[in-house]
Amino acid sequence: MALTEIFFQASPALRVHAPSAHAAGNRHRDSGYGHQASQVNFWLPLAPAFGTNTLHVENLRGDGRALPLEGDFGVVHRFWGHELYHHTLPNDTPATRVSLDFRAVPGPHFDDTQAAFFEGGYYARARRAADGWAVVLPEGHTLLRGNQAG
């Protein structure tokens, strides 16, 4: 069966990980923050990601081994952030890493009873249309186009 609806994080996170003796975040699973159980995390480096300037993700749930997501800019990585631990390390490289990350949930698996991560707030909805995908706006919302953005 083809996917006809998807919920996606309405505002992707832009992250900057400069050289530092401190990690940019703590080791965590998104389940600890109440995220959707079926979400898929997407991580997109906008600069080369390597060594300690990259995101580290648990290889298999519960194995405790985190592997670095290394690669050139523009390579998208996906993982099950709800169940896999992920974190950064102190960046001891000379390079600043810039990245985008966002989450998506296949439509049939979206839990609309979750108060913290709901449609019209954290998530937006897209539906398959004849010519691709169309964003479905909640009542009262408008989509800015081109020069309308100010």
Write out the residue ranges for each language-model feature.
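Signature of the catalytic double-stranded beta-helix
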Residues: M1-S20, G25-H28
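Residues embedded in well-ordered secondary-structure elements
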Residues: L3, S31, L89-N91
